[in-house]
Structure formats: structure tokens, C-alpha cells
Amino acid sequence: MKITKITTYRLPPRWMFLKIETDEGVVGWGEPVIEGRARTVEAAVHELSDYLIGQDPSRINDLWQVMYRAGFYRGGPILMSAIAGIDQALWDIKGKVLNAPVWQLMGGLVRDKIKAYSWVGGDRPADVIDGIKTLREIGFDTFKLNGCEELGLIDNSRAVDAAVNTVAQIREAFGNQIEFGLDFHGRVSAPMAKVLIKELEPYRPLFIEEPVLAEQAEYYPKLAAQTHIPLAAGERMFSRFDFKRVLEAGGISILQPDLSHAGGITECYKIAGMAEAYDVTLAPHCPLGPIALAACLHIDFVSYNAVLQEQSMGIHYNKGAELLDFVKNKEDFSMAGGFFKPLTKPGLGVEIDEAKVIEFSKNAPDWRNPLWRHEDNSVAEW
């Protein structure tokens, strides 16, 4: 079997799919994207295709190493996202050829279900509370929400009080009937993170995500030393070499590699094993589409330390398409009591509605994240 063609499709709301075709008619799908840089990743995918056309798709490990090492410059969000989507598609092909789900090819299940959590948007406490009530009606009891709006490098007590007030009202409304993580989204400087984490401790959030930017990772152990709240990070780390430094430094309790940013299934399985060796849990980052989610689920079901799975159903970014709009076998992604079950169809287990993908790709938006500014008109972290 040989790879004959690679096609990319930019899609709403902010996704990109790729299709790898073979001379035997077996097709694999992947999801390579950096949100806000889809065209750049698309160019990288097509550059990498020169290494892939005419090659045997079953040699996933060798093709991965070629894509990573054949170029003198390596790593980073663009290259690793391009590799990630290609890697997903290669695993999809292998599973279809062998008539087995990817998790079966990786040694089989370590669990029968995985807890999912849902994003809850809204700037006002009442909006967040209403959103949680709605999601509880369909079985969710675990959530994630923004921990704060933009904060200055040194901000005032009013900004801190506003963030804490939202969390306090949520805990008061639901008590211990729900769990929620707080995403600082890298918006908070190290000095302000110390203040905010201390103030939030009485409300027992499940975790705090990206308490500071990944490039300030030297603060993770310092922040962890002052709190009992687990710290989470990983969506802006792109290879096992990035994660190695964080694991060695300590401080992170929940690792969040993104299967569409950090080299795909091949790389993230290695990252999961590294995390387990440090007694660090795994909760793959996934505010993206169905192929990315499927890849995450296969890792979840073969990784002992996986504890939570993010998913984008109803997320506020999903303008123009919802999580399963391009999927034919929607029922395979159904949840019971807030848990996903293993996908059982061969490969990634996603049946893509290709006609719909082609149609929607004709008018795909160029999504960009908002540009925020502080009161003094300096650029704020989004």
C-alpha cells in the first residue's frame, strides 16, 4: 500500500481536516490545526506531503521521524500540528486495514469509560450558573470556565474580587454536587497568579489551568508549593521535549497535551507514559473537532493516568458548525452520565461526511482570536 494524495479542508468554526488517500482505496482522516493559524499549518502539511507521497502508510513511526527530523529546524506549534494531523490519519488507515480500533492496536483498554467535562462560557456569574444548570440536565457534573478576564501585570483588588466573586457564587449555587476547573488561559502574571490562587483556594476548584504562560513554566513549582489546588498545563507545549522540562521541574499535577498540536497519537502516547512515571495525570486538551476528540479518546483508553477528557460540544467558539456536524456515526460519541465509552469502529472510529466537508470548506472562515487591550491600550493576553 502506498500514499497517493493528501487533501486539506479548512472548515467552520475554526477547524481543519485532512484526508490521506492510498492506492488500495483506504482513506485516513486527521485534524491538524492551530486555531487562528490554519492557513500556516495547511502550508506545512503540504510541505510535509513531499516526504509522504509514495510511502507505505503502515510505517507510522518511521514517517513520524522523517517529518520531525528530516528538516534541520523542528518543533513548535506549526510543524507539530501538521505532523499531528498526518499522524492521526495514518493511525486511522492502519486501524481500517487491520479492522481494529486504534486503542486495540496500542495494547487494549485500561478502562471502560472516561469522564468528560464541558466548557461553560459567560462573563457574568448568573450566565455561568444558567449554563451549568442546562448542562447538568444532559448528564454533566464536571465543567471548566474562565478563571478571570484580562489582568494587568500588577492589578488592583477589584479585579481579583471580580474573579473570586464568580467562583464563590458558583460554589454557593451547587455546593459539592459539581466539580469545575478554572482556566487562567495564560492571562495572569506570576505575581498576580500567587494572589488569585490564594483567594480561590476556599472554593476548591478541581484544577487551575495555565496559571501562567508555558514560557513562564519555572513558576509552576513555586505556585504549586503555595496551594493545594492541582495545577494543569500543556496545551501550548508541542513535543515530549517540551513536556520533559516541565515534568522534571515539578509543580504540574495534570498534563494537557493537545492531540492536534503535540505530534498526534504517536507523540502523545509517549508524553502520557512520561507523565505516569512522574505520577502526573493526563487530561488531553480538546476544544476542537471530532477527529481530534477521537484521537484523544484512543489515548485516554490506553493510558492508565488519564482522568478527564475535554470536549467542545456547545463551546462558544463553535459558530457555523457543532462538534458532530461532519460526523455520520454521531451515536458512537454519545455520553452516559458524563462519560465517553470507547469508539469501536476500525481506525479512529469516525465516519466523516465528506460531501458536507467539501461543501462547508468552500466558505471557511479565517478565525482569529480576539485582540484585547488593557486600560492603558497595551496588549493584553487573551
Curated annotation (Swiss-Prot):
<dbReference type="GO" id="GO:0008869">
    <property type="term" value="F:galactonate dehydratase activity"/>
</dbReference>
<dbReference type="InterPro" id="IPR013341">
    <property type="entry name" value="Mandelate_racemase_N_dom"/>
</dbReference>
<dbReference type="Pfam" id="PF13378">
    <property type="entry name" value="MR_MLE_C"/>
</dbReference>
<comment type="function">
    <text>Catalyzes the dehydration of D-galactonate to 2-keto-3-deoxy-D-galactonate.</text>
</comment>
<keyword id="KW-0456">Lyase</keyword>
<feature type="site" description="Increases basicity of active site His">
    <location>
        <position position="258"/>
    </location>
</feature>
<dbReference type="InterPro" id="IPR023592">
    <property type="entry name" value="Galactonate_deHydtase"/>
</dbReference>
<dbReference type="InterPro" id="IPR029065">
    <property type="entry name" value="Enolase_C-like"/>
</dbReference>
<keyword id="KW-0460">Magnesium</keyword>
<feature type="binding site">
    <location>
        <position position="183"/>
    </location>
    <ligand>
        <name>Mg(2+)</name>
    </ligand>
</feature>
<protein>
    <recommendedName>
        <fullName>D-galactonate dehydratase</fullName>
        <ecNumber>4.2.1.6</ecNumber>
    </recommendedName>
</protein>
<keyword id="KW-0479">Metal-binding</keyword>
<dbReference type="InterPro" id="IPR018110">
    <property type="entry name" value="Mandel_Rmase/mucon_lact_enz_CS"/>
</dbReference>
<comment type="pathway">
    <text>Carbohydrate acid metabolism; D-galactonate degradation; D-glyceraldehyde 3-phosphate and pyruvate from D-galactonate: step 1/3.</text>
</comment>
<comment type="similarity">
    <text>Belongs to the mandelate racemase/muconate lactonizing enzyme family. GalD subfamily.</text>
</comment>
<feature type="active site" description="Proton donor">
    <location>
        <position position="185"/>
    </location>
</feature>
<feature type="site" description="Transition state stabilizer">
    <location>
        <position position="310"/>
    </location>
</feature>
<dbReference type="GO" id="GO:0009063">
    <property type="term" value="P:amino acid catabolic process"/>
</dbReference>
<dbReference type="InterPro" id="IPR034593">
    <property type="entry name" value="DgoD-like"/>
</dbReference>
<dbReference type="InterPro" id="IPR029017">
    <property type="entry name" value="Enolase-like_N"/>
</dbReference>
<dbReference type="InterPro" id="IPR036849">
    <property type="entry name" value="Enolase-like_C_sf"/>
</dbReference>
<dbReference type="Pfam" id="PF02746">
    <property type="entry name" value="MR_MLE_N"/>
</dbReference>
<feature type="binding site">
    <location>
        <position position="209"/>
    </location>
    <ligand>
        <name>Mg(2+)</name>
    </ligand>
</feature>
<feature type="binding site">
    <location>
        <position position="235"/>
    </location>
    <ligand>
        <name>Mg(2+)</name>
    </ligand>
</feature>
<feature type="active site" description="Proton acceptor">
    <location>
        <position position="285"/>
    </location>
</feature>
<dbReference type="GO" id="GO:0000287">
    <property type="term" value="F:magnesium ion binding"/>
</dbReference>
<dbReference type="InterPro" id="IPR013342">
    <property type="entry name" value="Mandelate_racemase_C"/>
</dbReference>
<dbReference type="GO" id="GO:0034194">
    <property type="term" value="P:D-galactonate catabolic process"/>
</dbReference>
